[in-house]
């Protein structure tokens, strides 16, 4: 008779434990139910990127001294720097500079180690094209500043995202 009572007690304890676990999961689900949605309607709404966002690289041709530091620090040797040595002044003259954003991993090493600060990261992240060869930007394309999301009147920017309470 006692084994039957202990089995009944164990069964009751297991039932209470299972109900508690189910209740904990249900409480977590309910705590997520009252949060605001995180999804945005992308083409019409855009998030304003943070100050340290690593987007498309901007290049200033006049500042570059063709030292090729950007090529040396790049993990994939990506920037293509063509230069010519001017014998009369014994300095390098930059002829062409290009970066293929189809290969770039946006690590930011080239921007960080550039001695003349001719490279900078922009907030532009919409680089998709139908042809991957269009992602190879030369110094003219790299020199264009992107249109700021804030200045575009057709897009509603989302400044303050709801904070996630933990």
UniProtKB/Swiss-Prot annotation:
UniProt-annotated location(s): Plastid, Chloroplast thylakoid membrane
4Fe-4S ferredoxin-type domain ranges (all copies): 55-84, 95-124
Cofactor(s), names only, from the UniProt record: [4Fe-4S] cluster
UniProt xrefs under SUPFAM superfamilies: 4Fe-4S ferredoxins
Membrane topology: Peripheral membrane protein
Record key words, sorted: 4Fe-4S, Chloroplast, Iron, Iron-sulfur, Membrane, Metal-binding, NAD, NADP, Plastid, Plastoquinone, Quinone, Repeat, Thylakoid, Translocase
Gene Ontology terms, MF aspect: 4 iron, 4 sulfur cluster binding; iron ion binding; NADH dehydrogenase (ubiquinone) activity; quinone binding
Its EC number(s): 7.1.1.-
One cellular-component annotation, GO: chloroplast thylakoid membrane
An annotated GO BP: photosynthesis, light reaction
Cofactor note: Binds 2 [4Fe-4S] clusters per subunit.
Catalytic reactions on record: a plastoquinone + NADH + (n+1) H(+)(in) = a plastoquinol + NAD(+) + n H(+)(out); a plastoquinone + NADPH + (n+1) H(+)(in) = a plastoquinol + NADP(+) + n H(+)(out)
Binding site for [4Fe-4S] cluster 1: 64, 67, 70, 114
Annotated Pfam families: Fer4
Binding of [4Fe-4S] cluster 2, residues: 74, 104, 107, 110
UniProt entry tagged with the keyword Lipid biosynthesis: no
PANTHER family xrefs: NAD(P)H-QUINONE OXIDOREDUCTASE SUBUNIT I, CHLOROPLASTIC
Family: Belongs to the complex I 23 kDa subunit family.
Entry function: NDH shuttles electrons from NAD(P)H:plastoquinone, via FMN and iron-sulfur (Fe-S) centers, to quinones in the photosynthetic chain and possibly in a chloroplast respiratory chain. The immediate electron acceptor for the enzyme in this species is believed to be plastoquinone. Couples the redox reaction to proton translocation, and thus conserves the redox energy in a proton gradient.
HAMAP family: NDH1_NuoI (MF_01351)
Self-association and partners: NDH is composed of at least 16 different subunits, 5 of which are encoded in the nucleus.
Name this protein carries in UniProt: NAD(P)H-quinone oxidoreductase subunit I, chloroplastic
Species of provenance: Laphamia lindheimeri
